[in-house]
């Protein structure tokens, strides 16, 4: 138990250090006499609680907001880099995010079948959005890549075979239909 408390205290100190230059959090810290880490963690818990409770449908807008803002921030940073590793992560995220939004639009029954849908969706989106988790890469390798290879890239292979057959038939004088 002491290890858990020590680990939490270390992580809270890291949060305080990370947000040391944030003017808004510095002002809130001065007014409330609470460390920045407590303010960040408390705000995050409150935000997720609002999504979980979903009073008046607020869970939908808050979940989609979190699912958009954090990856949009990372996307803007990725545009400034020269590597493609972060690009693949983010493109995969945006594919999954768009897919979920299309399904939600056409299947409102899904929202009633799955309890706490907006909360679960938000947790899932955060899992695949944050580069530290590698969630988008896992989703891409396990689900998106096999589907795209089979249904999108598959016909191009047969188109190449058909083209080869046509060229061979022209060369030999055989008729094709």
UniProtKB/Swiss-Prot annotation:
GO terms for biological process: endoplasmic reticulum inheritance; endoplasmic reticulum tubular network membrane organization; ER-dependent peroxisome organization; nuclear pore complex assembly; response to endoplasmic reticulum stress; vacuole organization; vesicle-mediated transport. Keywords: Endoplasmic reticulum, Golgi apparatus, Membrane, Transmembrane, Transmembrane helix. The keyword Magnesium does not apply. It is found in: Endoplasmic reticulum membrane; Golgi apparatus membrane. Residues 1-35, 79-88, 128-177 are cytoplasmic. GO terms for cellular component: cell division site; cortical endoplasmic reticulum; endoplasmic reticulum membrane; Golgi membrane; nuclear envelope. GO terms for molecular function: membrane bending activity. The chain crosses the membrane at residues 36-55, 58-78, 89-103, 109-127. InterPro entries: TB2_DP1_HVA22 (IPR004345). Pfam families: TB2_DP1_HVA22. Residues 56-57, 104-108 are lumenal. PANTHER family: HVA22-LIKE PROTEINS, RECEPTOR EXPRESSION-ENHANCING PROTEIN. Oligomer. The short lumenal loops between transmembrane domains 1 and 2 and between transmembrane domains 3 and 4 may impart a wedge-like configuration, thus deforming membranes. Belongs to the DP1 family. This is Protein YOP1. It comes from Candida glabrata (strain ATCC 2001 / BCRC 20586 / JCM 3761 / NBRC 0622 / NRRL Y-65 / CBS 138). The gene is YOP1.
